[in-house]
UniProtKB/Swiss-Prot annotation:
Swiss-Prot/TrEMBL keywords: Carbohydrate metabolism, Cell wall biogenesis/degradation, Chitin degradation, Chitin-binding, Cobalt, Disulfide bond, Hydrolase, Metal-binding, Polysaccharide degradation, Secreted, Signal, Virulence
InterPro entries documented for this protein: Chitin-bd_1, Chitin-binding_1_CS, Endochitinase-like_sf, Glyco_hydro/deAcase_b/a-brl, NODB_dom
Location of the Chitin-binding type-1 domain: 256-298
Activity dependence on pH, as recorded: Optimum pH is 8.
Domain NodB homology: 39-222
Enzyme class: hydrolase
Family: Belongs to the polysaccharide deacetylase family.
Record protein name field: Chitin deacetylase
Reactions catalysed according to its record: [(1->4)-N-acetyl-beta-D-glucosaminyl](n) + n H2O = chitosan + n acetate
Native source species: Pestalotiopsis sp
Cofactor: Co(2+)
Residues that, per the record, bind acetate: 46, 140
Amino acid sequence: MLAPLFAALLAGAATASPIQERQSSVPVGTIITACTVPNTFALTFDDGPFAYTSELLDLLSSNGVKATFFLNGQNWGSIYDYTSVVTRMDAEGHQIGSHTWSHADLATLDAAGITSQMTQLETALTSILGKVPTYMRPPYFSTNALALSTLGGLGYHVINANIDTLDYEHDDDTIGVAFTNFQNGLASGGTVSLMHDVHAQTVHVLVQEAINAIKAKGLTPVTVGTCLGDASANWYKSGGGSGTTPPPATGGPSPDDTCGGSNGYVCQNSQCCSQWGWCGTTSEYCAAGCQAAYGPCT
């Protein structure tokens, strides 16, 4: 009975599904650390998109592997500078989740601050994909009762991991230590791993070794949603998320530092789009009136 179910889940994960009313059995506002579908494993990557993410997508494609990316809006880079990478993730059947707008420690924020961190990224993903994720990972795995309650109220499944490779400590010739951490977690029955696609050695060395080890153990690397038995239609909700839906950014990268308005241009190089439709980086552009659909706002 499990084989047909698993095959159906894989088929659903590999193709885009229309947004529809969600009927997920995966709980919201509760920390989840492990897969529930037998013989599956979820590779997850945090903190991107960044310079190495495209290479990682190439690697996953060459291995026939689907993964989950928990994205920030403004962290190592601005999500608006990597819109083509984000759309490629989605088109190739990977799962996109939220990692908050700016990698904030949610346990240090009040409900309004938590909501702001989530809805800022929802606005960005609405402009890029026309939809927002229902899965998220708290930065630092840090939550408290208020954070979980707020995230649950926003409809988010909260995903941690039971294998932390600590790859961020080994982005050099000690990357083998991160793989040892991975192997130890895998041997202990871990099924959800944490890595970061912002580190060169993770992408160039660690991921391939991890894929080899997963397959050698007879497990299938899949998205978090698939490993929890959740149909791909449930991984997202309609664009606009928990706040007001801005018009989608349709004009592409700005060629002349204009943005929004009738042209729909998106500011590049981490510039904000001011209320007057110009790209810049000072408070006049990034604070009051900033148009979050066309660049980051602070």
